[in-house]
């Protein structure tokens, strides 16, 4: 698959850790929706050592795609993720996505094992996620421009 998808290889090579799962996720145009939900498939989700972190990298998107997440206090954050950016998502919290545009939305979604190198790529906002019990802020963390958050496509 590495020869068939060199872009995926380029993106994955930035993670100096074990890669648990990689997939493409699509939302069809004209109202394609991922309903509000939480992902409770793995109790070891989080940014602590050895836990799984979920990262979204928009490959194809448009300005009419909205990702919405809710904090543990119920505050809502809406994000428009740009192509080539990279986002850490705390999937234990409620989230949803809708594509009201005319083009398909495709994300590369990667679950990686958390470690110091991966955490060093996050923006300073991630600090409050270290202890899940204290999380009260938004769930989407855009990764720092000078680190992982950068145009990679």
Which residue stretches match the model-derived regions?
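Catalytic core of non-heme Fe(II) oxygenases with the double-stranded beta-helix
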Residues: 8-86
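A structured, charge-rich N-terminal accessory region that forms the first stable segment of a protein
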Residues: 1-9
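Amphipathic repeat-derived elements
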Residues: 1, 152-153
